[in-house]
Amino acid sequence: MPSDSKNNYAAVAAAAATTAVAAGAAGYAVYKKMQGYDQTVSELRGNVSHLQEENAHLSRPVVGSMTGDDILLPGEKLTYLKPSNLAERFGKKEHTTPLIEKYEGQLQDFQDEHSIVTQTIYRNKDEHHKQFLRYLRAGPREKVYFNPKEVTAAIVTCGGLCPGLNNVIRGLTQMLEEYGVPTIYGVKNGYKGFKKDNCWIKLDGKKVETIHRMGGSALVCNRGNDDIDVMAEAIMKKGVNMLFIVGGDGTHRGADKIQQYMVKANYECSVVGIPKTIDNDIPVIDDSFGFATAVSEAVRAIEAGYVEATGAPNCIGLVKLMGRNSGFVVLHAVCAAATVDVALLPEMDISLPKLLDHIKQKIDKDGHIVVVVAEGCGATLMQADPNLKDAGGNVKLPDVGVYLKDKIMEFAKANGRNDWTVKYIDPTYMIRAVPANPGDSTYCHVLAHNAVHGAMA
């Protein structure tokens, strides 16, 4: 195993989930025997390396009574995601982690290039010849790339608000201090703050001690990632060599451009992207932070809609929840509430006439109905203008909640049902603004710590 594989693997989107994560791996070669057949990890050009069987033609005994007992079946491949590796450009550097001395030898669970997490352990007989992802596990390394005393770190939060942002800021700051990093900046106002000196503030454990009790972001979020060159130059001018960027897809596109600029400038900096989406629509991880809190708050809104719908005759309780491109918040909240009659997701092809007919049938039968719709359904039910975008580059969605309310009342009037009422609830900003619940708080804590471990590795 080349020793360079132990060096820095931090890169854009490096901090992934609680159980899986890591800052990624450089391409390397390994020869390994696994249950009587040979496998080779071959280094490839580009961003991935494939684990392939050499002797796929050999028959293998099935272990146990069910197909899938083995991690890798004949014809399957494991794919490594390869982020940039600072050691490839600046040479190998190894420093003993200060955590050993800090915890007086009590820290034993170090990870290395052999510690992996596979995308799934679930199998069925039809999944032969599929490709699965493989990641290095998150966690502290015994040897790290950076000398922590020479690190200047910066943290920025971008995009919209999400429960748990302050927990992540707090966790990053505290773990950086654990490593002994002398200078930690918090950059206010998102990417736009990089260009303004008064947006760079010093962080320490005392300043972030209680911010996790509050919603929002102590660093203030903002959208937009223009002037990449100017931002990158400002970052380099401050001497930052460890950058933590918390945000969604638009934010990570910006992070990638910043990292590319630094590569061209031959500037040594570990750029770590920490995924933030309240919609939970990242396929690489099981849950994104803030999602569990959002579902809990969404259930409260649904319960209010149910109370309103059942508390008046011929009433429609209509609740709009977040979900730009996916309906995970709606799906989980609806299942948890167990009081919803119709759930509309962005993944569906929705027929408005059929929906209205169903609402009429339900009201005629029971006198009420509860409908929950994801914001992204506006792209299905209405015509969104692809040229209208927000500062983050996302297409602005028409308000499907108000649209549905109006269409329901138009339908009622056309059918002589002037006794119908619609109680419309849009809790979007209330949900985004709350502090993280205990589950999300714990997740953010571990996620932030692992992001620092990955950046140091």
What is the predicted function of each stretch?
Residues 2-12, 23-41:
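Short hydrophobic alpha-helical membrane-entry/anchor segments
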Residues 17-24, 55-92, 143-193:
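N-terminal phosphate-binding or glycine-rich loops at protein starts, especially the Walker A/P-loop
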Residues 24, 34, 45-135, 142-144:
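Long, compositionally biased, glycine/small-hydrophobic-enriched stretches that function as flexible linkers
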Residues 54-100, 388-457:
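C-terminal non-catalytic interaction/assembly regions of soluble proteins
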Residues 109-147, 193-243, 251-252, 278, ...:
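Glycine-rich oxoanion-binding loops at beta->alpha junctions
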Residues 152-162, 217-220, 241-247, 273, ...:
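Short glycine-rich or small-residue beta-strand-to-loop segments that form or flank ligand, phosphate
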Residues 170-217, 419-422:
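Anionic-ligand anchoring segments at beta-strand to alpha-helix junctions in alpha/beta enzyme folds, i.e.
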Residues 234, 245-247, 253-272, 283-423:
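Accessory alpha-helical/coil subdomains and C-terminal extensions
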